[in-house]
Amino acid sequence: MEMDKRMKSLAMTAFFGELNTLDIMALIMSIFKHHPNNTIFSVDKDGQFMIDFEYDNYKASQYLDLTLTPISGNECKTHASSIAEQLACVDIIKEDISEYIKTTPRLKRFIKKYRNRSYTRISRDTEKLKIALAKGIDYEYIKDAC
């Protein structure tokens, strides 16, 4: 399965800054009925722990344009509580994905926009995003414009 351009466009425009990799995993499971092939323990550029999910030829973090660095086995000890917390969240999500989506307003909104926005509108938003990023305009401004 390839990375979905419509989903990435929405994540980077209308939902910029609202989603994390757990949300992306839940959305992929709900919309495409596709489970991750691998779970990667990582940290972001600020050193915050985050789980990334690997699919056939992309990662959940790519939908958010996040650069995550995988952590080593020794580093897992320092992030043990975060790992346990996020793995518990993953289990809750996987247990009943539709209930999780229903009880998470931003994911419910995302799915509604994903299903109801036309391909033309999403393509137009994607073009705006490319132009704005090329000109150095920040994501918050782009989010408000879409």
Swiss-Prot record:
UniProt subcellular location: Host membrane; Host cytoplasm
Family, similarity comment: Belongs to the orthopoxvirus OPG112 family.
Species of origin: Monkeypox virus
Classification via InterPro entries: Poxvirus_H7
UniProt main location, coarse: host cell
Swiss-Prot/TrEMBL induction comment: Expressed in the late phase of the viral replicative cycle.
GO CC field: host cell cytoplasm; host cell membrane; membrane
Function in brief: Contributes to the formation of crescents and immature virions (IV). Interacts with phosphatidylinositol-3-phosphate (PI3P) and phosphatidylinositol-4-phosphate (PI4P) lipids in order to form virion membranes. Mechanistically, mediates proper formation of OPG125-hexamers, and hence the honey comb lattice and spherical immature virus.
Domain of life according to the entry: Viruses
Keyword tRNA processing: no
Gene: OPG112
Protein's UniProt name: Late protein OPG112
Pfam families named among the record's database cross-references: Pox_H7
Protein keywords: Host cytoplasm, Host membrane, Membrane, Transmembrane, Transmembrane helix
Coiled coil ranges: none
Transmembrane segments: 10-31
Membrane topology note: Single-pass membrane protein
